[in-house]
Amino acid sequence: MIKLKNFLNIYNLNYKYQYKNKINLYLIRQGLNINLIKNLSSNIFLYMFIYNFKKYSLKLLNIFKLPDWNFFDCPNINYDNIIYYSSILKDNNLIYYLKNNLNIEFLDSILIKNNSIDIIFDSMSILHTTQYFLKKLGIIFLPLFDIIFKYPLLIKKYLGTIISYKDNFFANINSIIFSEGSFCYIPKYVKCNFNLSTYFKTNSSDFAQFERTLIIVGKYSYVSYLEGCTASLYKESQLHVAIVEIIVKDYGYIKYYTLQNWYRGDYLGNGGLYNFTTKRGICLNYSKLDWIQVEVGSIITWKYPSTILKGKFSISNFYSISFISNMQIADTGSKMYHIGSYTKSYIISKSISLNNSLNIFRGLVYIKPFSYKSYNYTECSSLIFGNNSLTVTIPYIKNYNNTSYVKQEAFVSKIEIIYLFLLMQRGLSISESISLLIIGFCSDIYNKLPFEFNLEIPILFSLKIKDIFN
């Protein structure tokens, strides 16, 4: 037993973001009821529409139930005994804290000069860098609750229009509790050449992060948005329930990147973060929405970014890498709803399952009767290696228009011993050989990331494989 404990401690040392930041925090821990909403809304009572939005969501809570169609049992979460709000007290020096505790080393680097970054720590935004030139263009990129104070009519107009509090169980809970997030508004005829980024970090034990992101892209506009996520290491699990709403108006274009490296738990499946996220966008005439995501962390992932192609000639692309191992479960995929005519969608998914992991891909393509000459192409490729690895593909196609066309392809393969043998004959170790094969398998997707992150993904994969096979 002592040897096993020491072994797990060594394994956990390899998780880069395991450190916990010792800092004074204001915490709210109580049951999921109206008193919690009042505590969370104490500073926004001037804007009753937010309070009412949360209150109406609470009234519908008992209507919903946890999904019962998953390949895994949803964890039994005690919603009366978790921390719903965690914020840094004002007596802390935030910049000193960031540089010395959070280990965010890019604050003084060239990277921040080409990005506008919002850093959300637990339940509050602790650093926001909005470039002066963005303000001159009329671009609004601020923490969600700053927007509520500064532009309440804008929030009232768009909040919950794409993902209602009636949508599903987790969307309903987020609508009750959401405490922070990001808001982005790109005016019409504006091409944003800066990368807008949000970094989420959960730090407190028994903490649940409920953030909400809302992005509006105006007519003939363009923006690139990236979110990154990490979590501290605890024996107890943490919870992350998020909502992302995206509205792309006529001729608009957005690239939405996601890099998630939450804590994945130990080799026995203890600890780790539960990630339940609802993401959805709507595209109007001639607009385009790209989802590009890389999933590495979290013990359980439940996420299906989807697009409503409402306008004619609208396009949506979904590119995903899901890389899991050692008791991790990823139930992910995408949904494409074709409503307008001449719409196109592409779903390209790459999943890698190593040692005792479960990877599920669900793809829904729905083409309505009045969506003429629309097209979808779905390709799901899976790679498995090690003991007790499982990958599952569940396509679901509804095509109600005989002028529209859907194409589906799926591949499952394993890392052949002969390939490893050939690489090891040339001086590579077992972990280096596996890394080379996996990186080559999914390079066409991570190459779509911005240059700075494109370089880091192979390193991240190599480190994870080295932890497993060395």
Curated annotation (Swiss-Prot):
GO MF, one example: metal ion binding
One GO BP: iron-sulfur cluster assembly
Induction text: Expression is not affected by oxidative stress.
UniProt keyword annotations, A-Z: 4Fe-4S, Iron, Iron-sulfur, Metal-binding
SUPFAM superfamilies in alphabetical order: Stabilizer of iron transporter SufD
Top-level taxonomic group: Eukaryota
Pathway of action: Cofactor biosynthesis; iron-sulfur cluster biosynthesis
Subunit description: Component of a complex composed of SufB, SufC and SufD in a stoichiometric ratio of 1:2:1. Interacts with SufC. Interacts with SufD.
Role of this protein: Participates in the sulfur mobilization (SUF) pathway for iron-sulfur (Fe-S) cluster biogenesis. As part of a complex consisting of SufB-SufC(2)-SufD, involved in assembly of [4Fe-4S] clusters. Exhibits ATPase activity.
NCBIfam families (alphabetical): sufB
Family membership: Belongs to the iron-sulfur cluster assembly SufBD family.
The protein, known as: Iron-sulfur cluster assembly protein SufB
Natural source organism: Plasmodium falciparum (isolate 3D7)
